[in-house]
Amino acid sequence: MKKIIATITTLILVTSCSNRLVQHENNGFTYSEISIKEGGKWVDGKRGHKEYEGGTFRNVQEHTLDPQHTDHAFDIRYEGPGWENQNVGYRLYLDWRNAVDIFGKKVKTQVLQDVGQDGFDSYHDPQPWGQDILKAGKSLGIGGFGRLVNDTVAHLHQVENTYVKVKNSKNVSSFEIDYSKWKTADHTTDVKAKVSIYPYDRFSKFELKTFVLTNGLTNGLVKFKNIPLQQKKSANGSWGYIATYGKQTLVDKNDLLGMAIFYKSDEVEKLVNGKDDHLIVFKPTTKTMTYYILAAWAQEPNGLKNETEFYNDLNSKLVQLEKSNRL
């Protein structure tokens, strides 16, 4: 009888609705969501574009962007899909910026379902659970993608349609985004992106595919003054990373954060020192490309507390990637 009850309990947790976590045997969890406003209306905003006024947020499994949506339009809670495990949270700006931001967590429990419910951008201020800790600015944040055109990163200003679908399953939480007819300069392509998080560690997996050969497709890591870039390849050169560590958060002038992107060497054309980002430029292909992002906040409970611990962790992951081609 106890085994039957335990099995039923596990199934309930695994098949839970979109605003509940997926619990795992190791007591970790994963969760992803997107939350949109309903019951309000579009009005002329103070920033020169339409804003969504009134209504209440509701979690949905899938969503097609309203043509009037842009940054700070207030129709999507914390501006895009979010994903987390017990160590870290992330969010992606589902608009022209297409940047990835970081939620630093001070607790090991699920938090995203409540983030932004008490005020659209209250997560910029310190909360008991943590806060938004990264200032992305004009950059791609940590692992967002764009296209390098004449030494300038073109974000997703011109996209005909954007569709996102969220999935919470037994061993992973993820979301997929289909960008239809992304235009940069004289080039147009559809793009599919899949982002996944697991119940352990701090990394998140990105799978990216363009349907037309695209020169200059790039991801990036936001640059901060006086924070040096570190680069390293695995022993056989099959994988590499770019990373930064230091006082580079919104919290206070002494707060420490490590950020990294792991990439497959045979998928990458070059590394570029961009204006706002450290860039990883991919070779043109219509095959799916894979990379991983990782954020380690010094205030994370039982986390990586200093630069030495951070880079030791990255180097151990390079060994793992070389051995198994995955984290």
Model-derived features with residue positions:
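Acidic (Asp/Glu-rich), glycine- and aromatic
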Residues: 191, 202-234
